């Protein structure tokens, strides 16, 4: 019952879509209506409002971090922490408050990894930054970081074995890659948007 309750709370935390909330508060168009239609920081950046994109990034990462931090703070066992990590991530992907239309989970996963172990989170974030800096593709950076996250976990803690948190990290990586399947097709076709590209979006209530 304790694990179920913790996972439910984590899912509800994850279901708060900061891309939609921040855009609404700042008078921007719903990020699900323009660009990639993904409610995430990269798509919010396409509105031309960097402040909104940063707030979205920080908010989405924070909810992943706080969910796992709270689980640790209250002394929950590793199996509960693993379920909390998965639940907050799934909440972002399929938010109950926003008709289950969520983001792809990059920032939230980063927050989870930082809470699991700061070195794991920072190593994964640095991987994202390096790829994004050289190639300017947020999706490619996310895919590479997702592949390396479980590898970093093995280097830090050894093979997963009976470690439920390590399996949760692997599960999030697989889900993140799956959520980017459309981006993979666009990357292969040379049609993927680069970081900073603006689409017809909405810094002012949906008007370009």
From Swiss-Prot:
<keyword id="KW-0472">Membrane</keyword>
<feature type="transmembrane region" description="Helical">
    <location>
        <begin position="115"/>
        <end position="135"/>
    </location>
</feature>
<keyword id="KW-1133">Transmembrane helix</keyword>
<keyword id="KW-0997">Cell inner membrane</keyword>
<protein>
    <recommendedName>
        <fullName>Glycerol-3-phosphate acyltransferase</fullName>
        <ecNumber>2.3.1.275</ecNumber>
    </recommendedName>
</protein>
<dbReference type="GO" id="GO:0005886">
    <property type="term" value="C:plasma membrane"/>
</dbReference>
<feature type="transmembrane region" description="Helical">
    <location>
        <begin position="3"/>
        <end position="23"/>
    </location>
</feature>
<feature type="transmembrane region" description="Helical">
    <location>
        <begin position="78"/>
        <end position="98"/>
    </location>
</feature>
<keyword id="KW-0808">Transferase</keyword>
<dbReference type="GO" id="GO:0043772">
    <property type="term" value="F:acyl-phosphate glycerol-3-phosphate acyltransferase activity"/>
</dbReference>
<feature type="transmembrane region" description="Helical">
    <location>
        <begin position="140"/>
        <end position="160"/>
    </location>
</feature>
<keyword id="KW-1208">Phospholipid metabolism</keyword>
<comment type="similarity">
    <text>Belongs to the PlsY family.</text>
</comment>
<feature type="transmembrane region" description="Helical">
    <location>
        <begin position="51"/>
        <end position="71"/>
    </location>
</feature>
<keyword id="KW-0594">Phospholipid biosynthesis</keyword>
<dbReference type="Pfam" id="PF02660">
    <property type="entry name" value="G3P_acyltransf"/>
</dbReference>
<dbReference type="InterPro" id="IPR003811">
    <property type="entry name" value="G3P_acylTferase_PlsY"/>
</dbReference>
<keyword id="KW-0444">Lipid biosynthesis</keyword>
<dbReference type="GO" id="GO:0008654">
    <property type="term" value="P:phospholipid biosynthetic process"/>
</dbReference>
<comment type="pathway">
    <text>Lipid metabolism; phospholipid metabolism.</text>
</comment>
<comment type="function">
    <text>Catalyzes the transfer of an acyl group from acyl-phosphate (acyl-PO(4)) to glycerol-3-phosphate (G3P) to form lysophosphatidic acid (LPA). This enzyme utilizes acyl-phosphate as fatty acyl donor, but not acyl-CoA or acyl-ACP.</text>
</comment>
<keyword id="KW-1003">Cell membrane</keyword>
<keyword id="KW-0812">Transmembrane</keyword>
<keyword id="KW-0443">Lipid metabolism</keyword>
<comment type="subunit">
    <text>Probably interacts with PlsX.</text>
</comment>
């Amino acid at each position: 019952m304790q694990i179920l309750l913790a996972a439910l709370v984590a899912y509800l935390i994850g279901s708060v879509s900061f891309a939609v909330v921040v855009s609404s508060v700042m008078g921007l168009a719903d990020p699900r209506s323009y660009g990639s239609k993904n409610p995430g920081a990269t798509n919010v950046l396409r509105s031309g409002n960097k402040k909104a994109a940063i707030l979205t990034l920080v908010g989405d990462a924070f909810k992943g971090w706080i969910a796992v931090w709270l689980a640790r703070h209250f002394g929950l066992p590793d199996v509960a922490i693993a379920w909390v990590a998965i639940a907050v991530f799934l909440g972002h992907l399929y938010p109950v408050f926003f008709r289950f239309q969520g983001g792809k989970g990059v920032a939230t996963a980063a927050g989870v990894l930082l809470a699991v172990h700061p070195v794991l989170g920072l190593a994964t974030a640095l991987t994202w930054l390096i790829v994004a800096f050289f190639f300017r593709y947020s999706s490619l950076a996310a895919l590479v970081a997702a592949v390396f996250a479980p590898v970093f976990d093995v280097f830090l803690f050894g093979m997963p074995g009976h470690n439920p948190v390590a399996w949760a990290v692997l599960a999030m990586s697989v889900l993140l890659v799956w959520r980017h399947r459309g981006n993979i097709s666009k990357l292969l076709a040379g049609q993927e948007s680069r970081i900073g590209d603006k689409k017809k979006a909405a810094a002012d209530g949906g008007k370009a």
